[in-house]
């Protein structure tokens, strides 16, 4: 069978993807296409190139950014951004892996999907990639004047500076490289900031020429779109190429016969005295799908639960505070396993290594408990059947899975067809074969291809790196002639002029986009009924969930005093991680994994529409197959009514884990920390969120880590107070998502859960008013900054209108993108508006600047005043806003979204009104919003998380300074 030059190689019906999978080969070029035909309306496409680098200059990563900066058919500066501005896309991005670069798109709108695919195809095969693009996205030297200092700039350069500021990222990179010393995985495909400036434009261009060819491409389609059109989209591009050999093969790393130990410094704070260690093993090839499934289950057995033997041994050892390491890494040709401890005392790495090996030896010798095996099998099988890819489209998850073999010229269908390997593994286990004990010996105990990677703290490293970079640039400056200096200034000015020059109307018109007429005028409501069961208020959502029941029960936090709020997240964790009077935490975790798809508790905070009062809940959520609904509700009742808070050692471990997790996430997620901090200054719900997950929470957890040692009785008493204040039937809400039959069958179990809850009454406490906001710098040992400025626009007199969503989205994708990312060199910038509370924040991500970015924020009003918005730009902004409103949600997320709307009184009629206001947005709304942004500039509050640049700005302006790491 041949169509559009493609020949069918293989076809299979796969229940695992609910459809047909076809492998096609393009005869003229050798390009392969994996075409999945099923009923998923969230259509997905991807083009993947094998791109193993030969150095750590980040060439593949910089090229990934750059091909999306203009192409032959779409000659605008950033078609990627134009698509983001005005598409109904459900996914639009690109990824650089150690050996491949992927360009995936997804949309539930057919015409929009075709538009995205065409722009991406032109981008990857016929990109502009001129020298200015390379300088902007990769690196360049910036000089404002012939006498002034030189600076390295570039989006990827600053992105990777941020990566190398995170100890977790550094440890992960060194762990991978330590196992692959002889091939491409021993390099950094993302780019090492110290090496990136060695990349030349010539080498950059050559990499595209050699790797971005159909002969080196794997195409992927997924969804309910007609297959014939898939070929028609690809054919015009492939017709311009002929087959050729591409030097992109990824070899196997030869097996090492001697373990390695490597030690590296990392940038710690002034008080940082803790190290990190990871033990790493090279394991099987991804082509061995049966063995890979064994390793996935073994990972769950060893680490998947709080009471898993290796996790438990490491945490209870007291050698560190939390696990580190990626576990099983499956994105490369050869998999590897990594596990270790964060925050160890320097010099104790060998103790950690010995403990890991002894624990594994004990399991191999004495056997893996049968209950742990059952839990692992159930958990892995549940995940496979649920196919819950979260924020990623299911098609994208399938594409990544297929590439595990396909990229290396293996069978792309095998990783998708998991039913037979699963059945075979179950049969082996049923026969009594010691599958996991044998795997422990084979891959861990008898495997000499392993490494120990140690990170040691260095409080001077960040400053030394800055000084080394400054000295390098000074030497370069000193070596330049006067004419060279002038030329460098001219090049800087030319790049800025190019960045600031608008695209022509003709070029912009070439970008395909939807019209307002293509947009649905009505919102699609989520099914919801309200009822009671056992005196418990119940929300039910009749949605096809493929036989899975999702359940969440929520309890108000209104009666919790402010001083106890930071204890709520750990109290929630305690429900499922400390055991009950019937079973200890190991037994409870194993039972949960055997009977359900998971259960956990966490806070939920939002703002009530109109009243601007907080909605704060503790949410216990779980999921199970329909036939195990009784187990799900029985276990929910058990943890809610019988959780055991007496285990001091276990609770102390949880506190230390929480502290380590918070500290390690500060730098990688600095923008989130800044947004949370700004919202806390301007809304009561924001203040509660900060107490439950921000810097205030980190400070409270640090204090708690001392108190569990010095005054456990008071901590135990506080946990009991929280139990009494929170876990009762009063105002509790049960949220259920499943098909109608499953919902009906669950009613008796829901009623029993309601009856099991205490009937105590808690009195809501009045909330203290917000204090005066303060400008502040939060100092961390990072080479980049996260710069924020925020306010509450309702306090400034603004009344909500749906056009605000259109305007802030336009600012994010236009003004801030151009000024902060393109010209400023930051990795990203956001304009975040919470319509319920009124808090607005402009925040940057991995930003080399502070003052310049703040000046951009303050100039937003002037930008809006002068904005000459074309009809096209207005339409794009409206289309993009509707895309946000209609974001594609998997079944469980639809039920959760309906719950959130119910709790905040975000009614369907009001959401429809907002939709109409979005669709009716005009230029006048942009002009009027300029005055809101002018007030935001005048009255807003600054929060910057960063290193020396943040400290210098804070000192100059008299901001409050706090060292948080």
Regions found by a protein language model. Give the residues of each.
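M16 family metallopeptidases and their MPP-like homologs
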Residues: 42-52, 78-126, 133-142, 169-194, ...
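Active-site His/Glu-centered metal-binding helix of metallohydrolases
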Residues: 59, 63-67, 571
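Generic recognition of flexible, low-complexity loop/linker segments
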Residues: 91, 205-209, 265-267, 324-329, ...
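Hydrophobic, small-residue-rich alpha-helical packing segments that form membrane-like cores
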Residues: 142-235, 242-266, 271-273, 278
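Non-catalytic, conformational "gating/processing" segments within enzyme and secreted inhibitor domains
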Residues: 205-236, 715-750, 938-939
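Extended, regular secondary-structure scaffolds
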Residues: 218, 227-245, 366, 446-449, ...
């Amino acid at each position: 069978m041949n169509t559009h030059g493609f020949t069918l190689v293989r076809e299979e019906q796969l229940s695992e993807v609910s459809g047909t999978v076809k492998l096609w080969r393009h005869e003229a070029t050798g390009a392969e296409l994996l075409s999945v035909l099923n009923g998923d309306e969230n259509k997905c496409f991807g083009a993947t190139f094998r791109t193993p680098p030969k150095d750590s200059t980040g060439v593949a990563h910089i090229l990934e950014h750059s091909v999306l900066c203009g192409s032959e058919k779409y000659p605008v500066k950033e078609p990627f951004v134009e698509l983001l501005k005005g598409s109904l896309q459900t996914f639009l991005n690109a990824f650089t892996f150690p050996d491949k670069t992927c360009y995936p798109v997804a949309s539930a709108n057919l015409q929009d999907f075709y538009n995205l695919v065409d722009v991406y195809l032109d981008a990857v095969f016929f990109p502009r990639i001129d020298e200015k693009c390379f300088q902007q996205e990769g690196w360049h030297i910036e000089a404002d004047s012939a006498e002034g200092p030189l600076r390295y700039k570039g989006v990827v350069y600053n992105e990777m500076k941020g990566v190398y500021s995170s100890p977790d990222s550094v440890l992960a990179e060194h762990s991978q490289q330590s196992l692959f010393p002889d091939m491409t995985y021993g390099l950094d495909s993302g780019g090492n900031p110290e090496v990136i400036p060695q990349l030349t434009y010539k080498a950059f261009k050559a990499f595209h020429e050699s790797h971005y060819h159909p002969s080196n491409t794997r195409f992927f389609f997924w969804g309910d779109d007609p297959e014939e059109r898939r070929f028609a989209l690809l054919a015009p591009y492939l017709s311009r190429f002929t087959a050729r050999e591409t030097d992109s093969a990824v070899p196997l790393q030869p097996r090492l016969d001697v373990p390695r130990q490597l030690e590296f410094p990392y940038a710690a704070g002034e008080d940082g005295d803790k190290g990190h260690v990871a033990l790493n093993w090279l394991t099987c090839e991804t082509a061995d799908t049966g063995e890979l499934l064994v390793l996935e289950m073994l990972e769950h057995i060893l680490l998947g639960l709080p009471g898993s033997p290796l996790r438990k041994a490491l945490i209870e050892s007291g050698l560190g505070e939390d696990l580190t390491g990626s576990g099983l890494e499956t994105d490369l040709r050869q998999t590897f396993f990594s596990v270790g401890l964060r925050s160890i005392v320097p010099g104790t790495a060998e103790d950690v290594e010995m403990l890991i090996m002894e624990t594994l030896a004990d399991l191999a010798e004495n056997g893996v408990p049968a209950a742990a095996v059952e839990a692992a099998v159930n958990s892995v099988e549940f995940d496979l059947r649920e196919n819950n890819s979260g924020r990623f489209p299911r098609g994208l998850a399938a594409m990544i899975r297929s590439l595990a073999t396909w990229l290396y010229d293996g069978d792309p269908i095998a990783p998708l067809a998991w039913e037979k390997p699963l059945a075979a593994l179950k049969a082996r286990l049923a026969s009594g074969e010691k599958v996991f004990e044998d795997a422990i010996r084979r891959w861990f105990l008898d495997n000499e291809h392993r490494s120990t990677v140690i990170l040691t703290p260095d409080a001077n490293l960040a400053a030394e790196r800055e000084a080394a970079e400054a000295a390098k640039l000074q030497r370069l400056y000193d070596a330049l002639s006067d004419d060279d200096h002038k030329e460098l200034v001219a090049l800087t000015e030319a790049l800025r002029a190019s960045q600031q020059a608008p695209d022509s109307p003709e070029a912009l018109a070439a970008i395909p986009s939807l019209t307002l007429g293509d947009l649905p005028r009505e919102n699609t409501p989520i099914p919801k009924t309200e009822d009671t069961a056992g005196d418990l208020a119940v929300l039910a959502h009749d949605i096809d969930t493929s036989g899975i029941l999702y359940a969440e029960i929520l309890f108000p936090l209104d009666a919790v005093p402010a001083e106890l709020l930071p204890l709520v997240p750990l109290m929630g964790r305690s429900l499922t991680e400390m055991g009950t009077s019937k079973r200890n935490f190991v037994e409870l975790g194993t039972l949960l994994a055997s009977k359900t798809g998971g259960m956990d508790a966490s806070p939920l905070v939002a703002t009530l529409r109109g009243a601007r009062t907080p909605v704060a809940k503790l949410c216990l959520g779980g999921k199970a197959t329909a036939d195990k609904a009784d187990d799900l509700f029985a276990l929910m009742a058990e943890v809610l009514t019988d959780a055991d808070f007496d285990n001091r050692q276990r609770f102390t471990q949880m506190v230390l884990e929480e502290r380590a997790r918070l500290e390690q996430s500060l730098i990688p997620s600095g923008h989130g920390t800044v947004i949370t901090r700004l919202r806390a200054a301007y809304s009561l719900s924001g203040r509660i969120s900060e107490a439950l997950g921000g810097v205030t929470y980190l400070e409270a957890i640090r204090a708690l880590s001392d108190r569990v040692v010095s005054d456990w009785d008071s901590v135990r008493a506080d946990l009991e107070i929280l139990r009494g204040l929170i876990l009762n039937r009063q105002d509790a809400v049960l949220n259920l998502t499943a098909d109608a039959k499953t919902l009906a069958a669950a009613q008796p179990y829901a009623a029993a859960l309601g009856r099991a809850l205490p009937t105590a009454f808690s009195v809501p406490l009045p909330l203290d008013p917000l204090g005066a906001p303060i400008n502040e710098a939060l100092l961390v040992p990072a080479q980049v900054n996260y710069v924020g400025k925020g306010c509450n626009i309702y306090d400034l007199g603004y009344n909500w209108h749906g056009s605000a969503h259109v305007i802030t989205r336009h600012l994010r994708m236009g003004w801030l993108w151009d000024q902060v990312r393109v010209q400023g060199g930051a990795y990203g910038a956001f304009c975040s508006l919470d319509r319920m509370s009124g808090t607005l924040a402009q925040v940057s991500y991995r930003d080399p600047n502070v003052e310049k970015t703040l000046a951009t924020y303050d100039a937003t009003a002037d930008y809006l005043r002068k904005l000459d918005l074309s009809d096209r730009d207005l339409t794009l902004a409206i289309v993009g806003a509707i895309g946000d409103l209609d974001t594609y949600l998997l079944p469980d997320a639809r039920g959760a979204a309906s719950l959130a709307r119910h709790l905040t009184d975000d009614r369907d009629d009001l959401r429809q009104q907002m939709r109409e206001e979005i669709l009716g947005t005009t230029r006048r709304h942009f002009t009027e919003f300029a005055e809101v942004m002018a007030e935001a500039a005048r009255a807003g509050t600054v929060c910057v998380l960063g290193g020396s640049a943040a400290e210098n700005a804070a000192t100059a302006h008299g901001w409050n300074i706090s060292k948080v790491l």
